[in-house]
């Protein structure tokens, strides 16, 4: 299990308790320090966090993941078998039949240690399929699902909805504090901050909006005053 330093603690405890044989792979550098080093926080368009902590880890191996098409529009474009490359433009996709035809060449690709093969065996499963399978086989699940979470990933993931991120910073206030510290440091390094405080930089970041839209919604709308025309 690749840790990112922004994993929900409930997930880590669940894995350690129920799957003690799973190896916890700690990152060489926390995502906070990585953001400071890069001078920018991860965003929906600039998802360097995925490349650093998820996609390139495990190069040279076949990795099974639980991605499903029903989860999002982006994931609906995934295929059952994919080669993961650090460069998204060079990634390839196959179904099982195509993978069998190219298996020899794919193994050679994995052998160079620069790519990994990712297999999504439940890609076409629905939410009901997942829960039916878990209940039928008495497989335990993380408590976060019982607390209203539909999907679990990194806390404050840029790909999550704003509503999800607002809930997460309420549940995990330490993550918010850490990111605000990062905002202060990247501001010192010269990241364009439009004169915002680290707290406002964080609010802008989790909104996922452009600076103009975020600023207009947060500050300009508060300045509007409507003349009372009633007599």
Identify the role of each PLM range.
Residues 1-136, 231:
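ATP-dependent adenylation/nucleotidyltransferase module used to activate substrates
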């Amino acid at each position: 299990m690749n840790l990112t330093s922004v994993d929900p603690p409930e997930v880590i405890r669940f894995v350690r308790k129920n799957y003690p044989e799973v190896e916890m792979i700690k990152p060489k550098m926390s995502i906070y320090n990585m953001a400071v080093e890069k001078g920018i926080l991860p965003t929906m368009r600039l998802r360097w966090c995925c490349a650093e902590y998820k996609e390139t880890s495990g190069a040279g191996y076949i990795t099974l993941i639980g991605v499903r098409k029903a989860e999002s529009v982006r994931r609906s474009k995934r295929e059952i078998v994919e080669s993961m490359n650090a460069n998204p433009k060079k990634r390839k996709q196959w179904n099982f039949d195509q993978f069998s035809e190219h298996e020899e060449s794919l193994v050679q690709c994995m052998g160079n240690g620069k790519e990994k093969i990712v297999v999504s065996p439940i890609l076409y499963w629905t939410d009901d399929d997942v829960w039916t399978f878990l209940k039928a086989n008495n497989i335990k699940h993380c408590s976060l699902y019982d607390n209203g979470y539909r999907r679990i990933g990194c806390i404050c993931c840029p790909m999550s909805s704003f509503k999800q991120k607002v809930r997460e910073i309420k549940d995990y206030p330490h993550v918010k504090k850490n990111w605000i510290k990062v905002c202060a440091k990247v501001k010192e390094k010269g990241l364009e901050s439009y004169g915002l405080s680290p707290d406002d930089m964080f609010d802008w970041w989790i909104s996922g909006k452009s600076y103009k839209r975020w600023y207009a919604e947060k500050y300009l709308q508060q300045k509007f005053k409507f003349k009372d025309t009633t007599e």
